């Protein structure tokens, strides 16, 4: 900033970051939402993949600047007040030769560590196969462990609805990124 405050955000896409950064040089870094809209909405190089990761890096740098200017840690600037925060383990990823039994063993191991919430990957197999995976995981987790699902934008709108109905009885705590945020169809 012109006041000498630097914000840091990581991105391996230096060229994208430099291009987007030029669009906001000279702007008030505390006007965060306006700057975010300025680099995200015009679709500099698209709104997926590398471009989106670069917007995220700039966004993180802007939050870093805000916290430094305010003279406080970012969690406090965002209203944080807790002494403890809940956590979960992300797992259940697809791997060659990893079937239902291996998936169940993985989830059982997390529970043996004292974990009370797990997130698993869905979206790379058919809806029916992924629903079977969710059912199998719920069987080993029992009712007291939260189960979250992450599709990483794998579904079209109607597939997401269908999959949600298929797994509803297994009580997922949430279904993360079922569809692409920019898919308006």
PLM-predicted stretches and their roles:
Residues 59-95:
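Glycine-rich, aromatic-flanked loop segments that form ligand/cofactor-binding clefts
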Residues 53-54, 97-98, 154, 177-178:
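Residue-level marker of alpha-helix boundaries and capping positions
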Residues 48, 84-104, 122-123, 151-157:
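Active-site mouth loops of central-metabolism enzymes
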Residues 4, 20, 58, 71, ...:
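Conserved, mostly hydrophobic/aromatic
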Residues 76-81, 104-114, 134-143, 165-169:
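Acidic (Asp/Glu)-rich catalytic clusters
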Residues 16, 31, 35, 54, ...:
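General structural feature for long, well-ordered alpha-helical segments within catalytic domains
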Residues 2-69:
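Metal- or metallocofactor-binding catalytic centers and their adjacent structured scaffolds
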Residues 120, 125-185:
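Catalytic core of soluble alpha/beta enzymes
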């Amino acid at each position: 900033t012109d006041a000498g405050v630097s914000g840091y955000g990581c991105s391996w896409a230096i060229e994208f970051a430099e291009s987007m950064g030029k669009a906001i040089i000279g702007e008030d870094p505390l006007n965060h939402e306006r700057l975010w809209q300025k680099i995200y909405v015009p679709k500099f190089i698209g709104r997926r993949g590398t471009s989106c990761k670069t917007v995220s890096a700039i966004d993180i740098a802007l939050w870093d600047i805000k916290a430094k200017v305010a003279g406080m840690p970012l969690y406090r600037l965002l209203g944080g007040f807790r002494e403890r925060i809940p956590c979960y383990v992300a797992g259940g990823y697809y791997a060659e030769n990893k079937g239902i039994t291996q998936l169940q063993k993985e989830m059982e191991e997390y529970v043996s560590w004292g974990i009370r919430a797990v997130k698993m990957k869905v979206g790379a197999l058919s809806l029916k196969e992924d629903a079977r995976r969710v059912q199998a995981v719920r069987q080993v987790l029992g009712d007291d462990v939260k189960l979250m699902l992450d599709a990483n934008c794998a579904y079209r709108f109607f597939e997401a609805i269908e999959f949600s109905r298929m797994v509803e009885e297994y009580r997922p705590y949430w279904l993360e990124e079922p569809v692409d945020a920019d898919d308006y169809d």
